[in-house]
């Protein structure tokens, strides 16, 4: 099969030029031919001998790509956030706004990123050869992905620590009497509604063995008075973090050929464990009460704006658009791969997984409520408190608790690893495609990236590391990633053009996206993203962790981290504008015209300066 592909680096012609014969609006790519050969299921793309570019690596099998995308999208948030959001926002009624936002915004953005990466075969930065002024968006998402790696790997290290601690007949969070326990440690069997009173939820009680193991045994939080007093890294977590970094390096060092094989384990294991936990969970006493609470339908909650806001933010962060990962993964696909089908399949799998995980979670929460004779609302929670305190405590009361604990933390470990692999691949691919010297030394560059995340993660494994981690989690990938994806949607749909983007998709798959997708890309998705950005800013509150309130300077540091990535977008526009020689018109024209159409600028034929470009759908 022969594919005609072109991306000539045409130098701006500042002088006058004789008019050339009229050319079609979207010239075909006619430069180097890429010969596609199938060898034992591995596709090789061989450039013509005139090209100096190295052949781009491709996925060994289609399933490697699908598992990588699913593994990245399905992460810890599917387990520790969605079920609780569904419960507190009207149960089954929450699925209405959630599904609506999935259809009108989540899937279109997912589809857009896969198609963008697959057609251009570039990472998050160099993919913006379609509109050079927007390359700063690529650098922004790469930096955000790097920030996330600083703290996300620490959560994986916690999971590994818990996994190691589970290999004992008596789980260390089962009872009091350990060196880390406080004098206030209380046997969970003694806790019920009458003991806790009306103002203390069981999920907020800090003196259970499980809560003290997490905060005092693992984090050593009691030895820190705040973010100004974080102390030194803890050697146990340091060793776990080192193991995580080594695993990530050897999963990524040879590119998608190695990571595509690792995800066969990390992406499938969570489904096996989730199924086993679900089957066992529904047999426990009180499980039906938990599931009923999870699925209860309260349509009146849909009148509240917070329900719609929670649905919008959850669908965005759950699918993982905007981190450069989907672009990087898709760039290693075959040119004619059906990324439309992939987008529908993988985004649906992600959302269905979130929903199904709720049954496994709330069956256990129902069991806990039954055991302690409290209401479901007293044990329902989200985040780290759910997966590192409540769920482990529930597991410790089951027959064969060691087996269930090992299984559960293996699932968390797998969920974290393939998501972290995706984020690091976005950084590595994004920068390696932009700087060829990094691509030629991928193994060394991968080592540098993983070690850099390790070094900065050291701040998060100190005795006050949870304060640093919470700050990074709030600011590094909050408003900044929403802003970056908004700019991405505008760059593709408006400056590059939905019609031109649709023609690219037709070249790959033989059919153009329907009117629905084009309308979503041009109007609905940008409006959705703008809504979420505005809401995230309006709803911002000074940072807290439980009862601890961060000092004002910490919030300023957080906003500085957020702005450090966002500022790259306008900064690159200014840099590019100043680096282009020519008149004001020429500078703007070259900045918003795809690189393979720069020759049209010399002919004064710039689509973006014509009204029909902005009206096209």
Swiss-Prot record:
Regions that span the bilayer: 63-88, 93-116, 136-166, 234-254, 258-282, 307-332, 339-362, 403-428, 444-464, 466-492, 523-545, 549-569
Binding locations of Na(+) 1: 71, 74, 418-419
Record PROSITE patterns: NA_NEUROTRAN_SYMP_1 (PS00610), NA_NEUROTRAN_SYMP_2 (PS00754), NA_NEUROTRAN_SYMP_3 (PS50267)
Outcome of swapping residue 457 to P: Heterozygous knockin mice have tachycardia without a change in blood pressure or baroreceptor sensitivity, reduced brain and sympathetic norepinephrine transport, elevated plasma and urine norepinephrine levels, reduced 3,4-dihydroxyphenylglycol levels and 3,4-dihydroxyphenylglycol:norepinephrine ratios compared with wild-type mice, consistent with a decrease in sympathetic nerve terminal norepinephrine reuptake
Cited InterPro entries: Na/ntran_symport, Na/ntran_symport_noradrenaline, SNS_sf
Residues reported to bind Na(+) 2: 73, 78, 318, 350
Ranges per topology, Cytoplasmic: 1-62, 117-135, 255-257, 333-338, 429-443, 493-522, 570-617
Other comment: This protein is the target of psychomotor stimulants such as amphetamines or cocaine.
Name of protein: Sodium-dependent noradrenaline transporter
Organism ancestry: Eukaryota, Metazoa, Chordata, Craniata, Vertebrata
